[in-house]
Amino acid sequence: MPLYEHVFLARQDASTQQVEELTTQMTGIVEGLGGKVTKTENWGVRSLTYRMNKNRKAHFVLLNIDAPSAAIAEIERQERISEDVIRYLSVRVEELEEGPSAMMRKADRDRERDDRGGGFRGERDGGGFRGDRGDRGDRGPRRPRDEETADEE
């Protein structure tokens, strides 16, 4: 059977429970049509690049699916009908990615980065105006300004 990665975006005002119900509904459709969902990832609420249907944020969900194309067509039909789904995308792939997706790895990396103890960096010199840098010795003296060219401009 063909392999698919399917991502859908649910409205930001939908609760996490509603998003999980949508996910189980999609999983049920796939399994009912002879396929299986090998991985489900909820990426949480993320900001959108631009407004879609008056939404600036959305719940992102990834499904890795091993199913016939009829199952994907039915999922997409149900998502078109659903008012909670803003957008969806199904991509046929040669093989499904094992382990966490790139988005989940990025989220883990960001969490680790937060634990590094950023924040206050101590007292710092300077900041703002740094003063005159002095004469640049590598330059020769300045050329005299041509009075004629200044008058013409």
Curated annotation (Swiss-Prot):
Biased amino acid composition, Basic and acidic residues: 105-147
One of the GO BP terms on file: translation
Keyword line: Ribonucleoprotein, Ribosomal protein, RNA-binding, rRNA-binding
Gene Ontology CC terms: cytosolic small ribosomal subunit
Biological function: Binds together with bS18 to 16S ribosomal RNA.
Protein's recorded name: Small ribosomal subunit protein bS6
Organism: Bradyrhizobium sp. (strain ORS 278)
CDD domains documented for this protein: bS6
One MF annotation (Gene Ontology) recorded for this entry: small ribosomal subunit rRNA binding
Stored Gene3D superfamilies: 3.30.70.60
Residues covered by region (Disordered): 97-153
Coiled-coil regions listed: none
Family as reported in the entry's similarity comment: Belongs to the bacterial ribosomal protein bS6 family.
